[in-house]
């Protein structure tokens, strides 16, 4: 199914919106895709454009942290990472507000589900928001994701369905870090489907098929 894409600006940040033919009588998935560190929405779109999804609006936002050279991150590593992750949570809640506003303008009679996915730091972003974000999410997928140092807040998000994919040959996010992050999510009551593959730090064709099955089920 062909996606039609448009560029918008939300919260002063670039957002690439994709939309299939929408059947407003059925629930719509709003799928937010988080790019990796020091990257762009366009790089995430390269992966996301391979997703053949029905009744879905895709949202590829630009990260809030300027990493220089026209690339962006969701937070910076370092001694103030807890504060940076807290700022990410607040930014993403505001971005979800914008996505909800957009969807309400589409007159979706039976509502919509907010879903998240991401690669690398984007996978971490999806997991962090599922764990500590303001708004509940319907489904979350992480490819080569991890958990950063988390802020000292006690608020927890509602449990959701999580697909976590990681590779034994990933030389950027070691498999033990990804596996630990997914165990943490399970320990907080989330329904977890974890898949270890022989891949490196990448989004493979097999990953794309797993994502399609997950979000279409």
Question: Where on the chain are the PLM-derived regions?
Answer:
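Serine-hydrolase catalytic machinery in alpha/beta-hydrolase-like enzymes
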Residues: 6-109
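Active-site signature of alpha/beta-hydrolase-fold catalytic machinery across serine-
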Residues: 46, 128-132
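Flexible "cap/lid" loop of the alpha/beta hydrolase fold
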Residues: 70-77, 145-162
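Gly/Ala-rich beta-loop-alpha elbow adjacent to hydrolase catalytic centers
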Residues: 117-122, 126
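A conserved short beta-strand
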Residues: 135-147
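Short beta-strand/loop motif that positions the catalytic acidic residue
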Residues: 163-166, 170
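Conserved alpha/beta-hydrolase "acid-adjacent" motif
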Residues: 171-177
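C-terminal catalytic histidine-bearing segment of alpha/beta-hydrolase fold enzymes
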Residues: 179-217
């Amino acid at each position: 199914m062909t996606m039609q894409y448009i560029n918008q600006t939300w919260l002063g940040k670039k957002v690439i919106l994709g939309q299939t033919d929408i059947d407003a009588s059925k629930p719509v998935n709003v799928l937010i895709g988080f790019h990796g560190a020091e990257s762009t929405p366009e790089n995430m779109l390269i992966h996301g454009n391979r997703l053949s999804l029905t009744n879905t609006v895709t949202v590829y936002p630009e990260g809030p942290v300027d990493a220089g050279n026209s690339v962006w991150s969701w937070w910076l590593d370092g001694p103030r990472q807890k504060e940076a992750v807290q700022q990410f949570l607040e930014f993403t809640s505001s971005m979800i507000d914008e996505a909800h506003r957009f969807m309400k303008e589409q007159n979706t009679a039976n509502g919509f589900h907010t879903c998240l996915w991401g690669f690398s730091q984007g996978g971490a972003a999806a997991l962090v928001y599922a764990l500590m974000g303001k708004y509940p999410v319907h489904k979350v997928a992480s490819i080569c994701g991890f958990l950063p140092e988390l802020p000292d807040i006690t608020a927890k998000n509602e449990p959701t369905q999580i697909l976590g994919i990681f590779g034994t040959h990933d030389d950027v996010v070691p498999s033990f870090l990804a596996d630990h992050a997914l165990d943490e999510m399970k320990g907080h009551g989330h329904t977890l489907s974890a898949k270890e593959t022989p891949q490196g730090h990448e989004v493979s064709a097999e990953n794309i098929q797993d994502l399609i099955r997950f979000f279409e089920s």
